[in-house]
Amino acid sequence: MKLLLLLSFAIFLSSCVAPSPEPGIGEAISWNELPGWKNDRHAEAWPALLEQCKVLPKKKPAWANICNKAESTGKVNDETARLFFEAAFTAHRINPSKKEDGSPGTGLVTGYYEPLLNGSLYRSAQYRYPLYAVPDDLLRVDLAGLYPELSKMKLRGRVEGKKIVAYHDRSSIDNEDSPLRGKELVWIDDPVAVFFLHIQGSGRILMDDGSMLAVGYADQNGLPYTSIGKILIERGEIAREDISLFTIQQWLQQNPQQAQALLEENRSYIFFSIRENAEENPRGSLNVPLTPSRSIAVDPANIPLGSPVWLDTSYPHEADHSLQHLTFAQDTGGAIKGYARADMFWGNGDMAEKLAGEMKQAAELYVLLPGVGSKPSR
């Protein structure tokens, strides 16, 4: 009898466990529920807000009043900036996407940066790996007019006879008989550096004449991104806990005979344009200069571009060194998919490379949406 009662009680308790919340943007919460909210240097985030206010009201009318107030506020300190955000926005917890097996997921923050490469305008034995401009035959198809439900899909391809077919993949483009001959922007001295520039999306190039050239993302061939890091983990080449930009680079350098075949498994290919101002930070998908540690890339299908996003995470290899930071969703990336998923821009230089290359942190994300609803912080 006692056993039956204990069993019944256990079943009762299990039925009382709250189900994990559905992925997506949750209900409004108070500012006091944002971990570390009052401790951030909110004034440091202010320039990123002003940058996006140059373009956002035209794209999203709800931002017009916010930007008018921000631009007329003048100089701010940490407290006045924080109070501005509290008055203009409502905080919402972002519930992570579920894992492939349907179990509750966790948030993830990685990092990216602006690498420095070596290049030349002319091909030579040293500089023989090209960056390509957008090809003339790259077709972009807007399906929104015919199929509104597909308005968020970006279809790219090329015309072959009377059919639209997939655009050339990495294997075809990197071939000696590349179909893109004549569209080279610049020649680089290292194929691995070229590949990782595709992942970072923008970079600076020290030219052989001593000048500096800056390039940025212009378009993509339309084929899905495949993570070579994930492939190396699945093949047992690198342990999951050791995977990083640096361990992948090291593997490629130590396995030159297998390197090209591995790179070609990522069929996605990025095309570039020359940035007018080599000193300005690269522009993200929102078309504003990115701010180091304050700009993030997100999945725009889940987090609206331009949204302030509060991150509760940690620095790489320093789980006890919290990183609780106000950022802005100003960019996108082929590998950035899901709800509680972000890629932090760290800028350029050695420290930016180190932080971006090692960052793979569990995180909680909170999005700030226009409108008053959250209780003020005390």
Residue ranges of each PLM-predicted region?
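Bacterial N-terminal signal peptides
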Residues: 4-14
